[in-house]
Swiss-Prot record:
<dbReference type="InterPro" id="IPR004154">
    <property type="entry name" value="Anticodon-bd"/>
</dbReference>
<dbReference type="InterPro" id="IPR041715">
    <property type="entry name" value="HisRS-like_core"/>
</dbReference>
<keyword id="KW-0547">Nucleotide-binding</keyword>
<keyword id="KW-0436">Ligase</keyword>
<dbReference type="InterPro" id="IPR036621">
    <property type="entry name" value="Anticodon-bd_dom_sf"/>
</dbReference>
<dbReference type="GO" id="GO:0005524">
    <property type="term" value="F:ATP binding"/>
</dbReference>
<keyword id="KW-0963">Cytoplasm</keyword>
<dbReference type="Pfam" id="PF13393">
    <property type="entry name" value="tRNA-synt_His"/>
</dbReference>
<dbReference type="Pfam" id="PF03129">
    <property type="entry name" value="HGTP_anticodon"/>
</dbReference>
<dbReference type="InterPro" id="IPR006195">
    <property type="entry name" value="aa-tRNA-synth_II"/>
</dbReference>
<protein>
    <recommendedName>
        <fullName>Histidine--tRNA ligase</fullName>
        <ecNumber>6.1.1.21</ecNumber>
    </recommendedName>
</protein>
<dbReference type="InterPro" id="IPR015807">
    <property type="entry name" value="His-tRNA-ligase"/>
</dbReference>
<dbReference type="GO" id="GO:0004821">
    <property type="term" value="F:histidine-tRNA ligase activity"/>
</dbReference>
<keyword id="KW-0067">ATP-binding</keyword>
<dbReference type="InterPro" id="IPR004516">
    <property type="entry name" value="HisRS/HisZ"/>
</dbReference>
<keyword id="KW-0648">Protein biosynthesis</keyword>
<comment type="similarity">
    <text>Belongs to the class-II aminoacyl-tRNA synthetase family.</text>
</comment>
Length: 424
């Protein structure tokens, strides 16, 4: 007997029971994006490896340890995308979308990182990202945060997420701060774990978000990034905070909040939750005003975020018991007797013509009437439409409300109007 082939570790199948809630959540997310005037862009999941090395940074964990990279048959190094921003910027430059233009874009799809699989963290995971180009002010930063807050309210999770903000300033300001931070860490090497020692010279800002409690205690006495910010970054951040205050969006300024990707500057933010255990970040982003130029385009202000859909689904399921997923089927057509099967098929087609949004399923699996009713229940149908030999001959249909058991016999021509009333 042949050995079963199973899914790759950390890359999951999502079965119909799972995808129903995913589709419902995605529908809400897309509706809000549309309401803010954002347009979808679709990029390939494979890009040239140098794109991510240049954009994300050679000494980041993502590039050093987590990318799925391979050579194709021509010897070109390719990588499964670990995030979406770099590919979105590449597409914008390549197709002229960013030349003296304002763009509000969003994308959704799988990303890939070689990480240790655990709840909410997988090797293939899905992100929804939004990116805005051509707008330099704090007002667009605020809009992105307001957009995400509207998502949380629509999904019933707003009370279970908290917004954390920081400004990491300009590249020059960070260079000055980096020197001061490294000098401080060198004086306390004995407190640092191996991971922090490795990062101390290659990417010292990442020490700030170490999970080691001893390191966190040490950092209480470390130089503060806010003391090194350039004046423009200070004004930008103050403007953002003022806008959020006016919009009644609560937030916490977290001076140790830095992002794991090198392209960020000025505003960085995260929405975090305590309802998912260790994997607490649901959505994160910030400004990356230098990335377009870094990847070969003209200098273009930019800001965006990405959200992990697996974590979002887990959070909705954990805290919102009232979140409703629409039934798979509205009406189920049951048939019995000579000629009833073909009549059932034609009835279903005519109802789809009359009611395009109706979700209707026809029984093609045979079985007696009782078994067909069991199938209707399995699919969550609200109405059963029954056709026997006598109904076919009389061009009638028995319509049964499966919620209260009431039924009536109608002419086939009247069924669509009745269903619209029952299911509307």
């Amino acid at each position: 007997m042949a050995k079963n082939i199973q899914a790759i570790r950390g890359m999951n199948d999502y079965l119909p029971a799972d995808t129903a809630i995913w589709q419902r959540i995605e529908s809400i997310l897309k509706q809000v994006l549309s309401g803010y005037g954002y347009s979808e862009i679709r990029m390939p999941i494979v890009e040239q490896t140098p794109l991510f090395k240049r954009a994300i940074g050679e000494v980041t964990d993502v590039v050093e340890k987590e990318m799925y990279t391979f050579d194709d048959r021509n010897g070109e190094s390719l990588t499964l995308r670990p995030e979406g921003t770099a590919g979105c910027v590449r597409a914008g430059i390549e197709h002229g979308l960013l030349y003296n233009q304002e763009q509000r874009l969003w994308y959704i799809g799988p990303m890939f990182r070689y990480e240790r699989p655990q709840k909410g963290r997988y090797r293939q995971f899905h992100q929804l990202g939004a990116e805005v180009f051509g707008l330099p002010g704090p007002d667009i930063d605020a809009e992105l945060i307001l957009l995400t807050a509207r998502w949380w309210r629509a999904l019933g999770i707003f009370e279970h997420v908290k917004l954390e903000l920081n400004s990491i300033g300009s590249l020059a300001a960070r260079a000055d701060y980096r020197e001061a931070l490294v000098a401080f860490l060198e004086q306390h090497v004995e407190v640092l774990d191996e991971d922090c020692k490795r990062r101390m010279y290659s990417n010292p800002l990442r020490v700030l978000d170490s999970k080691n409690p001893d390191v966190q205690q040490l950092l209480d006495d470390a130089p503060k990034l806010s003391d090194y910010l350039d004046e423009e970054s200070k004004q930008h951040f103050a403007g953002l905070c003022e806008l959020l205050d006016k919009a009644s969006i609560p937030y916490t300024v977290n001076e140790r909040l830095v992002r794991g990707l090198d392209y960020y500057n000025r505003t960085v933010f995260e929405w975090v939750t305590h309802s998912l255990g260790a994997q607490g970040t649901v959505c994160a982003g910030g400004r990356y005003d230098g990335l377009v130029e870094q990847l070969g385009g003209r200098a273009t202000p930019a800001v965006g975020f990405a959200m992990g859909l697996e974590r979002l689904v887990l959070l909705v399921q954990a805290v919102n018991a009232d979140f409703q997923v629409p039934a798979t089927v509205d009406a189920y057509v049951i048939s019995s007797g000579e000629g009833a099967q073909s009549a059932a098929m034609l009835l279903a087609e005519s109802l789809r013509d009359a009611l395009p949004t109706l979700k209707i399923m026809t029984n093609y699996g045979g079985g007696n009437v009782k078994k067909q009713f069991t199938r209707a229940d399995k699919w969550g149908a609200r109405v059963a439409l029954m056709l026997g030999e006598s109904e076919v001959a009389a061009q009638q249909v028995v319509v049964k409300d499966l919620r209260n058991g009431e039924q009536e016999t109608l002419a086939q021509a009247d069924v669509a109007a009745r269903l619209a009333l029952m299911l509307g």
